[in-house]
Each structure stands twice: as structure tokens, then as C-alpha cells.
């Protein structure tokens, strides 16, 4: 679903008649939803005493993501159906009906993307929390590494689905519409299958609290927000610096992730002078190459971080002035992160 939004979100909104400036107001839902949903929903699931403490939020977020995806994919037929109910327009030949249908489609699509961003951020934070719940302190680094690998693999599969021509698949003919609608339905179904497997085969156990009186939802949300603020103010200085760097890095990643396919489409339109699904598939192919490179980097670069894996006795056997000892000390995740940030800035 995330691949669907990144690869086809901006081109789809532009095809509905929204300007490039207006799409920026749509995508502001991404960081805004992450700022709100991830800490609040994570805190709510932490305080839950149910034996389904994480999974109930995961299933709820998954359901909302699926509904929002279908709302976006079928926004045009839904808008026509709503116009028929209200009785706007005399028929398909009425220009006023087309005008209202276009505006209604834009409203439903923008609303769907906002709901999708909030729900998918909730699904992401619950998934990460569920992984850490079942990993010991000694296994959390490995669990996070596998989480990153699965994200990269999902991105590759998602961008591949956006690259191939789904209109030629007979099994998807019942969906109707173009490439975007079929890609949306496929991504929603795959997400539902993966979340269902996770919820069925991941056990949880309820937590016990000393409080005997149940609190209301609004009270729990307020307490969660206050807790997040307190934790944020008490962060160590090195962690605050990392957060500041990530803030600035995200500002540069934002236009790349959401507008890279549009950039590829603009170059294709200058050459072909026309719009088609093939151009959108070309944008997905560009993101597929990006996902493949990210997968390779995620697998190779951590293994190059020798300083965190070299045992101290082995390090001490090297001569203090040897070049090998200096290289081992210098090759760390922090060094790779700094070098990656520099390349991103360039």
C-alpha cells in the first residue's frame, strides 16, 4: 500500500485535475499523521490490558487502510453514485454533472489519502511494537534488521506490481478501471493476508496494571500525549541531535519519495507528448530500481560495520599504529550513516 501511494499517488491526483501545488497539501498528511498517530497509538497499545493489546489496533488500522484504499481507487464510480442519489445532473451528457462528478472525485480522493496516511502510520507503529515485544534485548538488533529487510522486500514487490501491466491479467478483469485501481485492490488484499497471518500466529498476553478503574478513551489519549511530551523533553543530548538530523533529512526525502515518479512522467511526456498508463509504469520502474538498491544497501552496509562486530580481544591483537586497527575503528554504523547523509545532500 505504501508503494501504491508513493508510486501512483501524485500522478493519480494530477490526473484528477489537481495542481502540483495542491498535491503538497495532500501529502502533508504523511508527516502530520506520523507525528500524531505513532506516539499516541503506540502509547495506547502499551497501556492496553487486553490479550489482543497490539493485534486489535493492527486489525483496526488494517481495516481502515483497506477501506481508504478502496475509496481512492473507486472514487469516480462512488462520486457518480452519490450524484445519482442527490439527483444532480440530468444525465451523462449534462456538463454540470461532469463538473460536479470531477469535484466530488477530487474530494473523495483527497479524503481517502488523508485517512490512508493516518491509518498506515498506525499500522506501522503497531507492527514495530509487536516485533519488539517478542524479541529479547539481545535479539532486538536482529529483529530490527529483519524488519528492514521485509520492508525492502515489500517495496520491491509493490513497485513490481506497479510496473507490470495488470490490465493484461485475466484474473483482475472483474475489478475494472485502469492500472491504478487494480494495483490498489491487489495491494489491499496482500496487506490483509499478511496482517491476518501475523495476528493468527503471534501470541500476546495481557498486562496487569495497578489501577482498578478503567479510563476513558479521551483521558488515555491525553495521558499518552503528555507522556510523549515528557519523554521528548528528557531525551539525552545525542538522541536529540539524531532526531534533529532525521528531521532535516526527512525534509529532503519528502519531495524525492512523493514526486520522483512525477519527475519521470514529466520527462516521458516531453518525449511522447501524451499521457498513458505506460508512463505511470515507467515511474514505478524507477521506484523499483530505487527499492532494489535500498535492499542491497540494507543487506551489505550493516555487514561492513566491523567495529560493532569485532570482539575486543581480537581488536587488541592488532598493533596500535596499524592501518587495519584504524579502519576497524572507523568503520561503524555512525560512519556509514554520516556518509549516506552526505550523499543524500549532494
PLM regions with names:
Residues 23-48, 61-74, 152-160, 288-303:
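Central cavity-lining transmembrane alpha-helices of secondary-active solute carriers
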Residues 1-33, 238-274:
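Helix-loop boundary and gating motifs at the non-cytosolic
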Residues 12, 19-29, 145-146, 178-182, ...:
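Loop-to-transmembrane helix entry
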Residues 96-109, 114, 122-123, 127-128, ...:
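Intracellular loop-helix junctions on the cytosolic face of multi-pass helical membrane proteins
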Residues 35-52, 166, 295-335:
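Helix-to-loop junctions at the C-terminal end of transmembrane segments
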Residues 11, 128-134, 262:
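Intracellular helix-loop hinge segments at the cytoplasmic ends of transmembrane helices
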Residues 58-68, 112, 186-187, 194, ...:
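Residue-level signature of the transmembrane alpha-helical cores
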Residues 59-102, 339-346:
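C-terminal ends and interior cores of transmembrane alpha-helices
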Amino acid at each position: 500500500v505504501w508503494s501504491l501511494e508513493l508510486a501512483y499517488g501524485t500522478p493519480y491526483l494530477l490526473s484528477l485535475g489537481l495542481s502540483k501545488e495542491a498535491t503538497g497539501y495532500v501529502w502533508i498528511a504523511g508527516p502530520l499523521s506520523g507525528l500524531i498517530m505513532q506516539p499516541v497509538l503506540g502509547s495506547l497499545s502499551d497501556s492496553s490490558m487486553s490479550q489482543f493489546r497490539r493485534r486489535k489496533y493492527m486489525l483496526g488500522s488494517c481495516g481502515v487502510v483497506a477501506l481508504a484504499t478502496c475509496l481512492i481507487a473507486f472514487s469516480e464510480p462512488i462520486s457518480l453514485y452519490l450524484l445519482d442519489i442527490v439527483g444532480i445532473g440530468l444525465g451523462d451528457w449534462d456538463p454540470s454533472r461532469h463538473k460536479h462528478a470531477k469535484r466530488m472525485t477530487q474530494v473523495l480522493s483527497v479524503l481517502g489519502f488523508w485517512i490512508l496516511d493516518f491509518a498506515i502510520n498506525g499500522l506501522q507503529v503497531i507492527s514495530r511494537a509487536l516485533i519488539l515485544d517478542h524479541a529479547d534485548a539481545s535479539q532486538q538488533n536482529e529483529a530490527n534488521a529483519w524488519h528492514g529487510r521485509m520492508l525492502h522486500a515489500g517495496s520491491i514487490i509493490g513497485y513490481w506490481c506497479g510496473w507490470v501491466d495488470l490490465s493484461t491479467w485475466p484474473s483482475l478483469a472483474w475489478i475494472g478501471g485502469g492500472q491504478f485501481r487494480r494495483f490498489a485492490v491487489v495491494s489491499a488484499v496482500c496487506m490483509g493476508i499478511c496482517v491476518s497471518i501475523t495476528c493468527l500466529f503471534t501470541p500476546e498476553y495481557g498486562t496487569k496494571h495497578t489501577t482498578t478503574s478503567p479510563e476513558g478513551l479521551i483521558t488515555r489519549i491525553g495521558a499518552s500525549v503528555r507522556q510523549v511530551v515528557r519523554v521528548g523533553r528528557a531525551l539525552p543530548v545525542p538522541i536529540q541531535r539524531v532526531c534533529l538530523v532525521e528531521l532535516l533529512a526527512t525534509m529532503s526525502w519528502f519531495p524525492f519519495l512523493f514526486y520522483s515518479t512525477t519527475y519521470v512522467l514529466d520527462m516521458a511526456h516531453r518525449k511522447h507528448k501524451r499521457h498513458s498508463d505506460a508512463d505511470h509504469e515507467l515511474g514505478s520502474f524507477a521506484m523499483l530500481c530505487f527499492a532494489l538498491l535500498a535492499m542491497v544497501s540494507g543487506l551489505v552496509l550493516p555487514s561492513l560495520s566491523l567495529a560493532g562486530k569485532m570482539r575486543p580481544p581480537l581488536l587488541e591483537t592488532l598493533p596500535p599504529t596499524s592501518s587495519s586497527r584504524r579502519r576497524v575503528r572507523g568503520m561503524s554504523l555512525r560512519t556509514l550513516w554520516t556518509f549516506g547523509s552526505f550523499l543524500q545532500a549532494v
